Amino acid sequence: MGKGGNQGEGAAEREVSVPTFSWEEIQKHNLRTDRWLVIDRKVYNITKWSIQHPGGQRVIGHYAGEDATDAFRAFHPDLEFVGKFLKPLLIGELAPEEPSQDHGKNSKITEDFRALRKTAEDMNLFKTNHVFFLLLLAHIIALESIAWFTVFYFGNGWISTLITAFVLATSQAQAGWLQHDYGHLSVYRKPKWNHLVHKFVIGHLKGASANWWNHRHFQHHAKPNIFHKDPDVNMLHVFVLGEWQPIEYGKKKLKYLPYNHQHEYFFLIGPPLLIPMYFQYQIIMTMIVHKNWVDLAWAISYYIRFFITYIPFYGILGALLFLNFIRFLESHWFVWVTQMNHIVMEIDQEAYRDWFSSQLTATCNVEQSFFNDWFSGHLNFQIEHHLFPTMPRHNLHKIAPLVKSLCAKHGIEYQEKPLLRALLDIIRSLKKSGKLWLDAYLHK
């Protein structure tokens, strides 16, 4: 019935009952070939559309058969715009007698968290200070300039080369935190501007891929520390994490490596090799295999700029070695910072928690200081960042006291540590998991 329908026809259309579904029925549709999810009690069939999902089909697929309301709000700053894509996918609603939450999730925590989000919006905590991000970009470009001037003025001796490498590694680490801001759509109101600048920062300043990052990182945020859903805990049999995985490996007599020594070999193959070996290879292969030609062009522009800048000082082979040494230094920085908030927390199979509880279970904070903020790209406020991923990082400290209060109200632990302890806890966690594996391997 179009706009030309008469009043009687419109009334008849409104009287048509909307299909309703129980959670039992919805939860059956959690397969790769059959996906339903719920947002604000409305049921959507995303089976075919998930392939077109800008964030990737896996991240949205992880919520198949579940309520995705809070995840939907967390990832999308412009709800009115993305809501247009949902309308054709609507197939019904939750039955009136059904609770809004699936799997017995805590409705009171969810209600309080949504009230907290409304408070954050009323406090304008999702509003960006653009000068802040311009200064971040300026200091990255300044570091790049200082690095070039050092080798230009002092020559390519060992001391000047080491200084230049450390300055460039610092620039790369800071560019990594900055691309993270744009990737989360936390800078500009319009997603398209965030996407454009994201490609510039991660592509031209770092030589990486925006699509690759989106595909991995959004899954991590959607289901942090959940095996088979969070790619950040897929260690390719190199490490065993948490309590469940090492025991399972031990029971099955899986011994790809001596995991009881993983807290020792972590120093050899974790921080040194993640970026220069694994990520660098994976990023290039992903862009080629998935034909991400725009991302590849941005990445190539980085390598062209780097080699034009440093081949005159080191030659082709020397510049290539220099690049990988910078990646080696940056990798240490990246691994220690990114793992201190997650690897020490609960890592397990899907437990179907509410959004607030799932993020608090998987994340912890590091104490605030000017250095900690800069060193970690404000990921020392990992809890707040995970709860509100589109909130500009300069506002995370403002919402932290309210998050702490909500945790106290519901008896949820809010973990915050000094930086050194957070770093050392990585090793303690690996050692603990290694012991669990050895015990299960020998005795179960």
UniProtKB/Swiss-Prot annotation:
GO terms for cellular component: endoplasmic reticulum membrane. The protein sequence includes a number of characteristic features of microsomal fatty acid desaturases including the three histidine boxes HXXXH, HXXHH, and QXXHH (these domains may contain the active site and/or be involved in metal ion binding), and the N-terminal cytochrome b5 domain containing the heme-binding motif, HPGG, similar to that of other fatty acid desaturases. This is Acyl-CoA 6-desaturase. It comes from Pongo abelii. It is a multi-pass membrane protein. It comes from the Eukaryota. A motif (Histidine box-2) lies at residues 217-221. Gene3D superfamilies: Cytochrome b5-like heme/steroid binding domain (3.10.120.10). GO terms for molecular function: acyl-CoA 6-desaturase activity; stearoyl-CoA 9-desaturase activity. It is found in: Endoplasmic reticulum membrane. A motif (Histidine box-1) lies at residues 180-184. A motif (Histidine box-3) lies at residues 382-386. Its EC number is 1.14.19.3.
